[in-house]
Amino acid sequence: MHDFHMPDTAPPSGKTHPLVARLTTEFGWPRLENAHDLREFTTRPGAHCLFVPGDAARNLETPDAAVVLPELRQAFQNAFDCAVVGDGIETELRETTRVLKTPSFLFFRDGDFLGGIEKIRDWDDYIARTSHILAAKG
C-alpha cells in the first residue's frame, strides 16, 4: 500500500514566501532589516503600515496576508505606505508594540505606533479596524 503525501508548497523556514517577496520586488516596498531602517521609515511624514509576516512555513496565513495588504492599501486610496519587516527586527518589534501574533499589520504615523491588526480577518473587519486606527491621533 502506498501512502499519499501532499507536497509542502510553503518554502522552508527561513526562506521568504514568493507572495511576501512580491511585495518588495513587484510593489517596491522596502524591507526593514534593522532598527535604523525601521526608525527612518516610520518617522517619515504620514501614515505607514508594516507587514510582519512571521514564518510562512509554519504560519499558513502569511501568504494570504501578503495578498490582503496591497488590496487594503488600495481600498484606502494609498492613505498609508507599506514596508515588510525583516526577520532580524520582527521579534523586538512585536514585543515593543505588543502585537504578538503573525501575520500582522502595524500602523504608525510620524513615528508613533497607532495600532495593529493580527492574523487573517474578514474584509469588513479589516476596513473597520484600519479606519479606526488611521483616525487615531497617535
UniProtKB/Swiss-Prot annotation:
Stretches of the chain forming a coiled coil according to its record: none
Q: Which InterPro entries match?
A: NiFe-hyd_mat_HyaE, Thioredoxin-like_sf
Record's protein name: Hydrogenase expression/formation protein HupG
Q: Which Pfam families match?
A: HyaE
The record's section on SUPFAM superfamilies has:
Thioredoxin-like
Q: Which family does it belong to?
A: Belongs to the HupG/HyaE family.
Q: Which residues cross the membrane?
A: none
Source organism of this protein record? Rhodobacter capsulatus
